[in-house]
């Protein structure tokens, strides 16, 4: 009986640790784009730094190149302009 209880406790802790690890990995991924995706967007940004507003065609091409959703592309540019662009 004692061995069974010990085994159940170990299994319970093991399962809980797996759940915690998965949650941490999920949270870490949120908000960060993969490096190659970010570099594609940054390259477009640098090439169009005077007026960083992609056309619908530009956005469609970036969706194809990066695999991101259109909403993610739009949000990236909104955030990038807020953080890094000063229209002088």
Curated annotation (Swiss-Prot):
Listed transmembrane segments: none
One GO CC term, this protein: nucleus
Domain ELK: start-end pairs: 4-24
DNA-binding interval(s): 25-88
Keyword list, A-Z: DNA-binding, Homeobox, Nucleus
Alphabetized Pfam families for the sequence: ELK (PF03789), Homeobox_KN (PF05920)
InterPro entries: ELK_dom (IPR005539), HD (IPR001356), Homeodomain-like_sf (IPR009057), KN_HD (IPR008422), TALE_homeobox (IPR050224)
Cross-referenced SUPFAM superfamilies: Homeodomain-like
GO BP term, pick one: regulation of DNA-templated transcription
SMART domains listed in its UniProt record: ELK (SM01188), HOX (SM00389)
GO molecular function: DNA binding
Subcellular location: Nucleus
Coiled coil: none
Expression across tissues: Expressed in all tissues examined. Highest expression in leaves.
Family: Belongs to the TALE/KNOX homeobox family.
Descriptive protein name: Homeobox protein knotted-1-like 2
Organism: Zea mays
